[in-house]
Amino acid sequence: MSALNKKSFLTYLKEGGIYVVLLVLLAIIIFQDPTFLSLLNLSNILTQSSVRIIIALGVAGLIVTQGTDLSAGRQVGLAAVIAATMLQAVDNANKVFPEMATMPIPLVILLVCAIGAVIGLINGIIIAYLNVTPFITTLGTMIIVYGINSLYYDFVGASPISGFDSHFSQFAQGFIALGSFRLSYITFYALIAVFFVWILWNKTRFGKNLSLIHIS
């Protein structure tokens, strides 16, 4: 093997080795459990991955600028608990806030997004003005948000939150049945988020500035 071919092989192995490992693991899983490739299982994987895709889109912009956000997952958890307590059905006997009418879904989404934005703003201020590294800042924020989430969960009774408004259940858990394959609504939400972020990164001045920061 010539030096050039050896260098090309090592470059390919460095850049694409993870995909080879994933393919090997996938082959082992399929060999042990052939039902892994069933349409029902694939739809479940797609649904579960969609939530992570949405989170990853937010963190990806930070990674491009050589930052990170370890608190993203905890923020999603806090948003989920708050949203769940506000979107329970009115006739639910175990309603956390029995005097509260069921709030409109868009309003709750805006509320929890605002909470996430405030946490992100705090992270940004600490990083930009106090010169604390993103890793340390968001690690601390992650712990704090987890504590707030635990306190809020204890405040509402520390029991499973259920009995949601039917419109919210359909919004969050609805799907389109294509035979035995179920395409969940949340997958569509993830696709919309991907499209929005693609436009943001590739068609706006803000996105191009992000790319320039990464290159520099």
Where are these regions (language model features)?
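Transmembrane alpha-helical segments of polytopic membrane transport and secretion proteins
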Residues: 1-16, 37
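Transmembrane helix-bundle core of multi-pass membrane transporters
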Residues: 134-204, 211
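Conserved small/polar residues in nucleotide/adenosyl-binding loops
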Residues: 214-215
